[in-house]
C-alpha cells in the first residue's frame, strides 16, 4: 500500500475458521479508506475542523456542524450528510445523500422529535417526506439512577423500529460503561443485535438484523454510519481519530483546565476526547470532561489522611472506583463514570470494620 501521494482504498478479506469435521469457513471482504500520509487537518478561526484526508466539514455561526461531505476516494464512495437545528441548538433533521452518476441522491431524510425536558434526547424519528413514524424510543433512569444525571447514558430502555426486516420492539442491554451491547427482540426473546467497541468507541463489530437500524450505540449516543461520527448533544466526536471535531463550547472550563494541565507539565488539547484517556475520564454531553472519581471520598481521604497529597488521594480514588465494580460491599453509594458511567457501591478503607 502506497498512500504517500494520495489516499487509497484497501481491500481487506477476513477469514473465519471453525475447526470441525469438516471445518466451517466464512469470509467477508470489505474496503477501508486510508488517508494520505501525512494527513493534513485544516481548522477555521474558531477551531472547528473544516477538512481532513477524507471529509469536508461545514459549520454555522454557532459552531454547530451542518454538513459533512466526501472530498477523497472514488466517486462511487462519495457521501454527504446534513443537519438542521432549532433555536435551542437541538438537532431537528438529518439528510443523507450518495453520489450517483454525478447527482446527489437522498437515501434517508428524517426529522428528530426531542424530549421537551431533556436537551437533545430523541423520542421519535419521522420520515421528512410524509411524517410517518420511522423509529421511537422509550427512556428511563440512566446510570446515575436519575433521569438525566449521566446525560442519558445507559437510559434507553427500548426502541421500536416501524419497518424493515428488524421491525418491532427491541429491549436494550448495556455493558458496564453504558454502551449499548445487545438488543433483544421483545417478540421472540432472541438477540437481534450485538455491538463491540474499541477503547475510544470505535466500532469493532456490528452483527444481527437490527444492528444498523439502531442508531444509539457508544455511550448511548447517536451514531451516523456514513461518516462514523458519534453525535453528542453539543459536539460531534470521531472515534476513528479519538478527537472532537470542534473545541469545547464551555470556554471558561476549558481555559481553567488548560492552565491546570500546563502547570502539571501536560498540554491539554481542547478537541481531545476525555484528555486522551477514556478509561479515567468521561464526557456525557460533549461539553467538558471530568475525572473518574468519587469527590466525597477524595475529600475524606484528604481530611482523614493529611499526610497524603491531593494527587495521591485522587490516585487512590481512581483505584477504589475501578475496584468497586467488582467489590459490591455495603456502604456509601456513589456514581462514577468511565467514558460514560458505571454505578458502584463501596466503603472507604478507614470506615471498614
Label each residue range with its predicted role.
Residues 2-17, 31-33, 38-46, 55-64, ...:
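Aromatic-rich beta-strand edge motifs centered on tyrosine
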Residues 202-206, 235-245, 249-295:
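Short, low-complexity export/processing leader segments characterized by acidic and small residues
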Residues 26, 50, 66, 92, ...:
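Generic structural signal for well-ordered beta-strand positions
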Residues 18-27:
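Short, exposed coil/turn segments at beta-strand boundaries within extracellular/luminal domains
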Residues 14, 45, 50-55, 61, ...:
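Beta-turn initiation residues at beta-strand->coil junctions
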Residues 293-346:
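Secreted, short cysteine-rich peptides and small extracellular cysteine-rich domains stabilized by multiple disulfide
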Residues 73, 101-104, 261-263:
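Short consensus segments that form the blades of beta-propeller domains
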Amino acid at each position: 500500500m502506497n498512500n504517500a501521494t494520495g489516499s487509497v482504498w484497501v481491500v481487506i478479506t477476513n477469514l473465519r475458521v471453525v475447526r470441525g469435521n469438516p471445518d466451517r469457513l466464512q469470509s467477508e471482504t470489505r474496503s477501508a479508506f486510508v488517508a494520505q500520509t501525512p494527513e493534513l487537518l485544516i481548522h477555521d478561526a474558531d477551531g472547528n475542523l473544516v477538512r481532513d484526508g477524507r471529509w469536508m466539514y461545514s459549520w454555522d455561526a454557532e459552531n454547530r456542524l451542518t454538513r459533512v461531505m466526501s472530498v477523497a476516494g472514488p466517486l462511487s464512495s462519495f457521501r454527504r450528510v446534513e443537519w438542521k437545528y432549532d433555536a435551542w441548538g437541538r438537532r431537528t433533521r438529518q439528510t443523507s445523500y450518495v453520489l450517483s452518476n454525478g447527482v446527489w441522491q437522498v437515501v434517508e431524510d428524517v426529522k428528530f422529535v426531542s424530549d421537551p425536558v431533556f436537551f437533545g434526547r430523541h423520542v421519535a424519528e419521522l420520515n421528512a417526506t410524509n411524517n410517518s413514524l420511522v423509529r421511537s424510543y422509550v427512556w428511563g433512569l440512566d446510570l446515575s439512577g436519575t433521569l438525566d444525571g449521566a446525560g442519558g447514558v445507559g437510559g434507553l430502555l427500548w426502541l421500536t423500529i416501524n419497518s424493515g426486516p428488524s421491525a418491532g420492539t427491541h429491549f436494550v442491554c448495556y455493558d458496564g460503561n453504558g454502551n449499548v451491547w445487545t438488543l433483544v427482540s421483545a417478540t421472540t426473546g432472541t438477540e437481534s443485535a450485538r455491538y463491540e467497541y474499541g477503547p475510544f468507541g470505535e466500532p469493532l463489530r456490528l452483527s444481527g438484523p437490527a444492528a444498523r437500524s439502531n442508531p444509539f450505540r457508544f455511550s448511548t449516543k447517536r451514531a451516523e454510519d456514513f461518516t462514523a461520527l458519534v453525535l453528542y448533544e453539543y459536539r460531534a466526536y470521531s472515534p476513528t481519530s479519538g478527537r472532537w471535531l470542534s473545541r469545547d463550547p464551555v470556554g471558561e472550563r476549558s481555559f481553567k483546565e488548560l492552565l491546570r494541565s500546563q502547570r502539571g507539565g501536560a498540554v491539554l488539547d481542547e478537541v481531545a476526547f476525555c484528555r486522551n484517556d477514556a478509561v479515567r475520564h468521561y464526557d456525557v454531553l460533549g461539553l467538558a470532561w471530568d475525572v473518574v472519581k468519587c469527590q466525597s471520598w477524595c475529600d475524606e481521604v484528604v481530611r482523614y489522611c493529611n499526610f497524603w497529597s491531593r494527587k495521591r488521594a485522587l490516585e487512590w480514588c481512581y483505584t477504589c472506583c475501578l475496584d468497586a465494580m467488582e467489590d459490591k460491599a455495603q456502604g456509601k453509594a456513589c456514581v462514577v463514570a468511565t467514558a460514560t458511567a458505571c454505578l458502584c457501591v463501596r466503603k472507604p478503607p478507614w470506615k471498614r470494620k
